[in-house]
Structures are given as C-alpha cells and as structure tokens.
Amino acid sequence: MPLSTSLLGKKSTYKDSYDVTLLFKIPRINNRNELGINSNNLPFYGVDVWNTYELSCLNKNGKPWVGVGTFYIPTDSENIVESKSFKLYLNSFNNFVVESVKELERIILQDLSNVTHAKVTGRIFPINTKVEFGVPSGKNIDDLDIVCNNYGAPDNSLIEYEDVLVEEEINSNLLKSNCLVTGQPDWGTIVIKYKGKKLKHDSFLKYLISFRNCNEFAEQCAERIFTDIKNAISPDFLSISIVYTRRGGIDICPYRSTDKSYTLPSDKRFIRQ
C-alpha cells in the first residue's frame, strides 16, 4: 500500500480493541535503492531500537496495567514499521484483556516479526523501573564556531577530511530532520565512532545541520549518514547511533556498524528522552 492511500498523516480514530492490521509496513529496499545500498549485501549490521512509553492493557479482572517497552528490529529486516501506525497499534491494546505481561510481550513481538519479516526481539518493563540518564560518548562538536547556510537537502559535499589516520568518537545534539509522512520534526543526538581518515569536525557539523529541513524516516537518515561517511573516507571501522526524542510516545534509535560483532551503546536515556 503506498503512503498516499494509507491513514498516515491523516486524522485517525483510535481503535478500542486489539487490531494487528493497524501496523503499516514500509519496504526498506525503496529508500536503500535511493542511497545505492544493495539490500542483498548490506554494508552494515545493526538494529533499530524502538522505545515505547505509552503501553497499556487490561488484566483478567479488567484493571489497567501500564508499562514501557523496548523492541529491536534488525537492520536486515525486509520492512520497517511506520511509527504512527505502531502508536495506533499499541493503543489498540488499551481495552484488551491480556493474561499476563509476558503474553502481551509475546503478541507484540510476534506481530512485529510478521510485519517486518524478521526476528524482532524486545522486552516490556513495569512502569516503576529505575532509569538513569547518561550522556553521549565521545567528543561533542556542537560548540564549533561555524557559518551555516544549507538547510534544504543533506549535502555530502560538505564532508571534508584530513589525510591522517585516526580512531575517534564524536557526537552532536544538532541533528534534526522531519518525518516523511507528517512533516513533524525529529530531533536526534548522533554518536559516530570510526577508524580512518580524520573527519574535519567543522565541515562535518555543517553536513549534519544540512539535514535540518530534510523529509526522511529516521532509519533512512541514519543510513544516509553512514553511507556518506563511508563513501567519503572509506574507514576501516564505522559505527553510528542516533537517539531520537520521543514523538507520539515512541522514540526510534537506529544503530549501524561495519562490525558484525557490534555491541549496542549504553541503554541509558539522554536528557531529551
């Protein structure tokens, strides 16, 4: 189903009973073809981490239960799930009786796996789970004194490098783009770790800021940045993680790495989450 004929980006009525058909799948191949990424031979490994903060159902006595969930969609899944459709889907559990939290977890994981055509993992947590805030790892480049004038479309020609090999980790809180469906802003913190020719921090910050008015899904923004860095400096190692702020009770955190045995960054939330 094309986006134009879906309910996405339109006024929606919340269902009062569980409805898996609310999940709207989007093939990854469409955006990857645009980026020149071969879906049969991906240049990266990774996952999209989805954190859900508005999750509720009824127990067998009709009493509401609330919690939060974290779900991991592998980067080699055939499809992604559009975030608004996921929100509508989760809210369809609000008046649905579930025997246990484990049963709710099983249903959601099974539905996501079926829609994405991949093995989705995750867990649902009680609302009183203790949470600690963290800070992005690496060197922050946001205070560099630069002049910016490109906000129309991501401009990879802004990426410059020095002909010296380094291994470093940098981060920025200035990444911002817009949802392809709704046009609503997506605010992100990005952490880049790489080994290769040294990125010039000032020009790279300009590059990140050039996403400011870009209309793309969070996952595509992550893969565009990964691809642009890879094409620019041909690093021996590269990983990027983006932590987006929540919208509609959901935040999406894409992670991409050249390392098959990658380890996800800390699961501590940043202050904007």
UniProtKB/Swiss-Prot annotation:
Q: Kindly state a single biological-process term from the GO annotations of this entry.
A: queuosine biosynthetic process
Q: Give the subcellular location.
A: Cytoplasm
InterPro entries reported in the protein's UniProt record = GTP-CH-I_C/QueF, NADPH_dep_7-cyano-7-deazaG_red, QueF, QueF_N, QueF_type2
Task: Indicate which residues the UniProt annotation says bind NADPH.
Answer: S83, K84, R247, G248
Keywords associated with the record: Cytoplasm, NADP, Oxidoreductase, Queuosine biosynthesis
Query: What pathway is this protein said to act in by its record?
Result: tRNA modification; tRNA-queuosine biosynthesis
> Which Pfam family would be a valid example here?
QueF
Please provide, in alphabetical order, the Gene Ontology terms of the cellular component aspect for this entry.
cytoplasm
Kind of enzyme, top EC level?
oxidoreductase
Catalysed reaction, written as an equation: 7-aminomethyl-7-carbaguanine + 2 NADP(+) = 7-cyano-7-deazaguanine + 2 NADPH + 3 H(+)
Q: Does the keyword Transmembrane apply?
A: no
What superkingdom does the record give?
A: Bacteria
Q: What does the UniProt function comment say about this protein?
A: Catalyzes the NADPH-dependent reduction of 7-cyano-7-deazaguanine (preQ0) to 7-aminomethyl-7-deazaguanine (preQ1).
Official protein name in the record: NADPH-dependent 7-cyano-7-deazaguanine reductase
Q: Which organism is it from?
A: Rickettsia massiliae (strain Mtu5)
